[in-house]
Amino acid sequence: MCEEYTKEKIMEIRKKHIGPSCKVFFANDPIKIVHAKGQYMFDEKGERYLDCINNVAHVGHSHPEVTKAALKQMELLNTNSRFLHDNLVRYAECLISTLPEKLSVCYFVNSGSEANDLALRLARQYTGHQDVITLDHAYHGHVTSLIDISPYKFHQLGKDAQKEYIHVAPSPDTYRGKYREDHPDPASAYAKDVEDIIQKAHQNKRQIAAFIAESMQSCGGQIIPPAGYFQKVSEFVHKAGGVFIADEVQVGFGRVGKHFWSFQLQGEDFLPDIVTMGKPIGNGHPMSCVVTTKEIAEAFGATGMEYFNTFGGNPVSCAIGLAVLDIIEKEDLRGNATTVGNYLTELLNEQKQKHPLIGDIRGVGLFVGVDLVKDRLFRTPATAEAQHIIYKLKEKRILLSADGPYRNVLKFKPPMCFNKEDAKLVVDEIDQCLTALEKAIGIQSNAGLHEKTSAKRKVHNENSGDTNAKEKETCSSNSQERNPNDHAYRQSNGLHPESPTFTRKRIRT
């Protein structure tokens, strides 16, 4: 039997043999997970953690039906898709049945990155064009072609990292974006920016192959595009000879509840040309898929070049995929996402009335974001405060992450078996954390705080030298003048001393 390593030993070996860019959660005190079940994960001491961040274990960690399907098929056969096998075509039929009729051709691959990379190949072959429009703060994968279309990543490389054939459109964020909730038609306004990008590209003798977007931005801060945005963008992109790629890698398979696919939130009159899938598709097993139209698939095949993927669509992966689809239906996980998601959002909105640090609650189903702000008037991101909260929750055995361009958005994307009791537990703990934090940093909690009223923060006069110095009220946005990464600042303001500092290099969760 193999020796069981301590956390310290694991970190020592990781430092020696695992690349330094491969990060872990809670780097100052990482968690060693030894098993998981449903929405819970367990460490080496048997401590149970509520998992609020794992959109990979879609139907629940270690679901017995998924395990049974994998074992049964693995005992019989696992080979590649060049041999005929029932599982491949059965799974293709079942998957296609969840999509609009025109999306009818599958390419099975092994990760979301592979899926998005193949989607770009399909788009470029079909259109004969090269350029791609992507959204600001987008993340689409780790391979070179996808880093190129992921501002979330390439902005870290400097101002010259953006390729000339990549065009970045504003994220359709109606809370802190270019056009906000008070705009009469933010969907049209954001879509007009895409039209302007296309026109500018044409002026520079460039042609658009594709517009790609997550149906709801995850790493970008849990952004829900305004209704009608995708329809208008699709119209402009098609007119320019391009195609629309909907990235469902993080948000597909019923997470929004009402619909199986998040792009369907835009309405029945919107149809992407290519849809990519990953993460939840195999409940932790490495598999993914690209689904497109017959016309695009035929154009790709017309090159005469075979497309073969060694592991894509193998019998074991397809058996697992079938089990996941079956569980989503049998256990009514879409219904659960709607019911529990609505309950979670209601509880969080109650906390918004109580806590000035909460600027916005947004989400659909079990995809929810809590935008933390230093003040509601200027919507100044509460980055250090968000990191403090997720570390304090970790102490309570609750796993939550923060992301977005300022790392100030608490992200809920739990396994789909997440229930009302779990939601109540998490929100109660967030309430306690915010209450203690607001008291420590001098923000006055007020249930009746108006959206246009800044949260006031009491700041001691550090130059007086008097421990009983008179407190003065300042708009909390002034706190930007001090570095939230400074250790003394963090301790003096009640922030968790071990929580990670604000850096442009983020762990994608």
UniProtKB/Swiss-Prot annotation:
Protein name, per record: Ethanolamine-phosphate phospho-lyase
Assembly information from the UniProt record: Homotetramer.
Chief place where the protein resides: mitochondrion
Keyword Mitochondrion: yes
Biased amino acid composition, Basic and acidic residues: 451-474
Record EC number: 4.2.3.2
Family the UniProt entry places it in: Belongs to the class-III pyridoxal-phosphate-dependent aminotransferase family.
Gene Ontology molecular function: any one: pyridoxal phosphate binding
Positions of the UniProt region annotated as Disordered: 451-509
Reactions catalysed, as given in the entry: phosphoethanolamine + H2O = acetaldehyde + NH4(+) + phosphate
Organism lineage: Eukaryota, Metazoa, Chordata, Craniata, Vertebrata
Localization, UniProt: Mitochondrion
Positions of post-translational N6-(pyridoxal phosphate)lysine modification: 279
Gene coding for it: etnppl
Record keywords: Lyase, Mitochondrion, Pyridoxal phosphate
